[in-house]
């Protein structure tokens, strides 16, 4: 899948879940199941509830999202 096939949105982490997954509330109010991207996992970037994040959604499953960036 090419990079431009993803939908990028901003959201806020609502809750930590097991196995480095999170509940993320998007700007439009929807809540999705977010997981950390590989490079964020590799560099030990910590994500806590309340953090603003950028997520990528695939058009095939809009309930799961990849967390690709944590805003300062």
From Swiss-Prot:
InterPro entries per record: NA-bd_OB-fold (IPR012340), RNA-binding_domain_S1_IF1 (IPR006196), TIF_IF1 (IPR004368)
Keywords: Cytoplasm, Initiation factor, Protein biosynthesis, RNA-binding, rRNA-binding
S1-like domain boundaries: 1-72
Subcellular location, record wording: Cytoplasm
Major place of residence: cytoplasm
Pfam families: eIF-1a (PF01176)
GO molecular function: ribosome binding; rRNA binding; translation initiation factor activity
Cellular component, GO annotation: cytosol
Recorded superkingdom: Bacteria
Record flagged with keyword rRNA-binding: yes
SUPFAM superfamilies: Nucleic acid-binding proteins
Subunit record text: Component of the 30S ribosomal translation pre-initiation complex which assembles on the 30S ribosome in the order IF-2 and IF-3, IF-1 and N-formylmethionyl-tRNA(fMet); mRNA recruitment can occur at any time during PIC assembly.
Family per similarity comment: Belongs to the IF-1 family.
PANTHER family per record: TRANSLATION INITIATION FACTOR IF-1, CHLOROPLASTIC (PTHR33370:SF1)
Function as written in the Swiss-Prot or TrEMBL entry: One of the essential components for the initiation of protein synthesis. Stabilizes the binding of IF-2 and IF-3 on the 30S subunit to which N-formylmethionyl-tRNA(fMet) subsequently binds. Helps modulate mRNA selection, yielding the 30S pre-initiation complex (PIC). Upon addition of the 50S ribosomal subunit IF-1, IF-2 and IF-3 are released leaving the mature 70S translation initiation complex.
Matches recorded under NCBIfam families: infA (TIGR00008)
Designated name of the protein: Translation initiation factor IF-1 1
UniProt organism field: Dechloromonas aromatica (strain RCB)
């Amino acid at each position: 899948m090419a990079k431009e096939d993803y939908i990028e949105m901003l959201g806020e982490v609502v809750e930590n879940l097991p196995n480095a997954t999170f509940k993320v509330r998007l700007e439009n109010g929807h809540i999705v199941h977010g997981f950390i991207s590989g490079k964020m996992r590799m560099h030990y970037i910590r994500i806590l509830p309340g953090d603003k994040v950028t997520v990528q959604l695939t058009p095939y499953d809009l309930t799961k999202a990849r967390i690709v960036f944590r805003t300062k």
